[in-house]
Amino acid sequence: MIKNKKVAFVCAIHQSEAHRPNGFELFNDYLESIYTSCKYPFKLFGFDNESDDKFEVENLLDNLVITRVDDQYKGGCTYTWNEGIKMAIKEDYDAVIITSDDQIYDETVNDFIDTILTHEHKDNAIFGPLSNNPNNDYQRAYQPNGKIWEISGKPTEELNGFCLAMTRESIQHNYFDSAGNFFNTGKEYIWGKQDVEVQQRVEHSIVVGTCYVYHIKQGGWREIRAGLRR
């Protein structure tokens, strides 16, 4: 664990009776996994992306912020990612991990953070863990393998967008625009392209095989929006 470093998690949340009735249950399980596993000082920036019901927390913790987005046509997941990154940068977090509510973390998340903060390319790199459901072969695994390696980041060989992490310096070196957006602000009819596009700007794409994330991959909420496909 690297001393005097703090981490921000950015998480998109969605619940709907038609497409994702268990959305809040997923998020509760996600929260439990982060709060029981992460040893670094952290803050979780959650975005309730136009859920049918409003996510409410009794006795809200100081390091948990939930922002309600009333219209996900405003930009979908990408909007929440960008807004969460802006909040994290404003509050001087050293690393930012982009996630969604259908993921479960264990203590290997600390190895993930160690690598993000100490890797030789940390000032211009984007990082991703291993997972059971990464939509590619090079991140697919069912446990950590202890290896850390670079991939090209080009289309068909990029980190999957389910979990992407960067240092503050990498974000500041690779903004998409002057408004402080890190990801392409295009509408999500190009869903699946934002995570590809950003890796064309960031110089290095790194697979962190010391970390494993269980990805439930329940993205049915995307069907709400016409033309939205991953």
Short names for language-model regions:
Residues 18-19, 47-57, 104:
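A conserved acidic beta->alpha catalytic loop
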Residues 106-182:
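Conserved catalytic core of nucleotide-sugar-dependent glycosyltransferases
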Residues 93-104:
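Short beta-strand-to-loop acidic/aromatic patch adjacent to the donor-nucleotide binding site
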Residues 41-51, 67-71:
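Short beta-strand/loop segment that forms part of the nucleotide-sugar
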Residues 24-42:
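Short, acidic, metal-binding catalytic loop of nucleotide-sugar glycosyltransferases
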Residues 5-11, 34, 43-46:
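Hydrophobic targeting segments
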Residues 23, 180-230:
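C-terminal catalytic/acceptor-binding lobe
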Residues 71-88:
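Glycine-rich, basic loop-to-helix element that forms the pyrophosphate-binding segment
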